[in-house]
């Protein structure tokens, strides 16, 4: 077996969480599946909460990579760029929900319970909204206005008829 690393531990934890859920996954489960003692995990993580937090952050970074890497095309207005970026944000979250609903719900439920993770993610989104739009000190308001389209609480509604039209209505009101 390869040398034990944070990445190997996270991969195994994710596999077990997928099967058992977060509440039922223990460090003993993870260690046992890696053929190490649970004490070996403490060389990489302070505790189960630390491991799960790192796992949730990894998932959030992976699923948000395209959103934060987005750059506007040359010649496009800041308003059009913001519209396109917000639509990408909405559709990225929607696609993740459709692709692997179980993991989406597991991770987002976990993240939503951690105020610091939520605060940091929303701040990062707000910063990107300001960068894209050029609207200084308006990022939080922009992200809040479009909360229906990216907050996991509303995920079950993202497939309803009129979703795109509602997005455009909110956009017109904010524009």
Question: Model segments located where?
Answer:
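Helix-turn-helix
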Residues: 4, 8, 12, 16-50, ...
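Hydrophobic alpha-helical connector segments
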Residues: 54, 58, 68-95
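Hydrophobic alpha-helical segments that form the core
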Residues: 130-157, 162-174
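Short secondary-structure transition hinges
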Residues: 87-127, 154
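Short, structured helix-loop boundary elements
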Residues: 6-7, 27, 49, 53, ...
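Amphipathic alpha-helical packing segments from all-alpha helical-bundle domains
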Residues: 64, 80, 108-140, 162-165
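Amphipathic alpha-helical interface segments
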Residues: 12, 16, 88, 92, ...
């Amino acid at each position: 077996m390869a040398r034990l690393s944070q990445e190997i531990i996270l991969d195994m934890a994710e596999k077990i969480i997928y099967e058992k859920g977060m509440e039922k996954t223990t460090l003993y489960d993870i260690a046992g599946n890696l053929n190490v003692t649970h004490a070996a995990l403490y060389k990489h993580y302070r505790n189960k909460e630390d491991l799960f937090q790192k796992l949730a952050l990894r998932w959030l970074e992976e699923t948000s990579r395209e959103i934060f890497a987005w750059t506007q095309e040359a010649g496009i207005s800041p308003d059009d760029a913001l519209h396109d970026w917000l639509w990408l944000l909405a559709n990225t979250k929607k696609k993740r929900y459709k692709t692997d609903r179980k993991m989406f719900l597991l991770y987002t439920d976990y993240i939503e319970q951690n105020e610091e993770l939520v605060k940091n993610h929303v701040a990062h989104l707000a910063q990107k909204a300001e960068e894209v739009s050029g609207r200084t000190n308006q990022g939080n308001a922009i992200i809040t206005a479009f909360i229906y389209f990216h907050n996991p609480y509303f995920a079950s509604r993202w497939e309803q008829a009129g979703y795109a039209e509602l997005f455009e209505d909110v956009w017109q009101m904010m524009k």
